[in-house]
């Protein structure tokens, strides 16, 4: 696996971060969760669309991709973008909002994986992370220590969830929507995507002909 070119990746993030858009969410009827699981040299992407009000599953899609980029902190998108997008583009029913297992603007360069996906797809995206990547916790907020800017809101859904804008959303609306989607101690669309990605990983065989089928 070739190493990532850190400086080139940093420049890409800094350039694309200027395209992050803060805007009110559209009317939200459906929400997708995106996640990735790993086994050996393969990445298993999952997308699960649910109805916002009932949490009923509308559609699922999966992908299997070869890992071509190692994990490097703050550059997660360069590893997970491909499996997530390959699953997402297979969805027939495109969701109103996308939740991503990772950060949005709560990132040193304001461009975590949720922002990357939002800019690429030009869709409302929200980052939901279980751990802090950048910033200082002040009450229920994650704040940039240099500027005082609020990067994320911290909600309790099981444990802490750090909710940040990916793109085409506002922070208050993003946190409010994620709180609505909390069920049984987790953000439900993301839990379903996590479970599906791991189920695909366990079911996958090296000689599978239909590699991308959800189990």
From Swiss-Prot:
Site location (Interaction with target DNA): 71
Binding, Mg(2+): 35, 101
Main localization (coarse): cytoplasm
GO CC annotation terms, alphabetical: cytoplasm
Keyword Cytoplasm: yes
Described purpose of this protein according to its UniProt entry: DNA repair enzyme involved in the repair of deaminated bases. Selectively cleaves double-stranded DNA at the second phosphodiester bond 3' to a deoxyinosine leaving behind the intact lesion on the nicked DNA.
Xref: Gene3D superfamilies: archaeoglobus fulgidus dsm 4304 superfamily (3.30.2170.10)
Annotated compartments: Cytoplasm
EC number: 3.1.21.7
Catalytic activity: Endonucleolytic cleavage at apurinic or apyrimidinic sites to products with a 5'-phosphate
Domain of life: Archaea
GO molecular function: deoxyribonuclease V activity; magnesium ion binding; RNA endonuclease activity, producing 5'-phosphomonoesters; single-stranded RNA binding
Disulfide bridge positions per record: none
Record bears the keyword Metal-binding: yes
Transmembrane segments: none
Native source species: Pyrobaculum aerophilum (strain ATCC 51768 / DSM 7523 / JCM 9630 / CIP 104966 / NBRC 100827 / IM2)
Cofactors that this protein relies on: Mg(2+)
Name of this protein: Endonuclease V
Family, as annotated: Belongs to the endonuclease V family.
Alphabetized InterPro entries for the sequence: Endonuclease-V (IPR007581)
Entry keyword set: Cytoplasm, DNA damage, DNA repair, Endonuclease, Hydrolase, Magnesium, Metal-binding, Nuclease
Gene Ontology biological process terms in this record: DNA repair
The gene coding this protein: nfi
